[in-house]
């Protein structure tokens, strides 16, 4: 049986609690995770390599949610029904030192009435003879242009036994339906050999501040860091100059998102952004020509 517990925004984030005891069921989860805590913990090295299949009992042992925005125009369901059960899935993953490689990164079309799922590559670290695994996941509304981004977290002991897992959502790309969510689940990990996926080299990642320093002619506040944007409604922003990828902070309601490189965005929203950016660039280029010719 599952039980519901409701988390208030005034609850302190889990930053100093013993995460290990919570995952292994020795202490209750009483508040959401602070994602900055995951970033800090992930600095611990890991030299354990293994692979297997990860899945959960889809009915949570405990779940809390807070609906922040729900426009009635789009409402065709009871919100409570959305969180009674997590969509079923099975992940094949490999822990390769600090990296966690998800081998089935495609969108998972589930039998759930409301949600599809997607997972991407994450990170691993060791602490007190346990390997901690964290990876990004996204709940995708069926037949809609909305994605709700979260973080998965669990641990494995020296016998490859798995702890409970935590799923938490604190951001989204969705104008009409927004919520905070955290659930804790009984979990399973079946070790098995998986052909190792070669981790492709990514472009060097730098901050937006690095961009302004490299290109002094670009005024600060030229991107989504401008006052013209409501930073609370910006999922991600950045700039690629052909060599380096300059990324702005992926802010959430629970600190900085630990997996800004692997953030799933709705196709329609992303297409609008890319098309608009290219259109403005082309317009500016033509205007410069007109000014020169004039």
Give residue spans per PLM region.
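Active-site helix/loop module of the DD-peptidase/beta-lactamase fold
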Residues: 18-53, 285-294
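A short, well-structured edge-of-sheet supersecondary motif
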Residues: 153, 216-259
């Amino acid at each position: 049986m599952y039980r519901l517990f409701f988390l208030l925004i005034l609850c302190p984030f889990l930053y100093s609690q013993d995460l290990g005891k919570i995952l292994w069921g020795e202490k209750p989860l009483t508040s959401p995770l602070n994602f900055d805590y995951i970033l800090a913990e992930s600095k611990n090295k890991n030299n354990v390599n293994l692979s297997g299949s990860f899945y959960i009992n889809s009915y949570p042992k405990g779940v809390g949610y807070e609906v922040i925005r729900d426009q009635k125009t789009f409402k065709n369901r009871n919100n409570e029904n959305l969180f009674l059960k997590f969509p079923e899935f099975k992940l094949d993953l490999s822990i390769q030192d600090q990296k966690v490689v998800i081998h089935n990164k495609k969108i998972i079309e589930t039998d759930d009435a409301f949600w599809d799922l997607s997972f991407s590559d994450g990170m691993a670290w060791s602490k007190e003879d346990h390997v901690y695994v964290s990876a990004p996941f996204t709940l995708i509304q069926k037949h809609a242009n909305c994605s709700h981004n979260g973080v998965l977290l669990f641990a494995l002991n020296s016998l490859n036994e798995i702890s409970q897992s935590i799923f938490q959502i604190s951001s989204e790309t969705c104008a009409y339906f927004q919520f905070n969510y955290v659930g804790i689940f009984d979990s399973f990990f079946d070790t098995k050999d998986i052909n190792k996926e070669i981790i492709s080299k990514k472009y060097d990642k730098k901050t937006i501040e690095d961009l302004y320093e490299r290109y002094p002619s670009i005024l600060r506040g030229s991107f989504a860091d401008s006052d013209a944007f409501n930073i609370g409604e910006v999922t991600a922003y950045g700039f690629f100059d052909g060599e380096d990828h300059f990324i702005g902070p992926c802010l959430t309601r629970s600190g900085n998102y630990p997996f800004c490189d692997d953030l799933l965005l709705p196709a329609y929203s992303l297409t609008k952004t890319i098309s608009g950016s290219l259109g403005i660039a082309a317009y500016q280029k033509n205007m410069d020509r007109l000014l020169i010719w004039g």
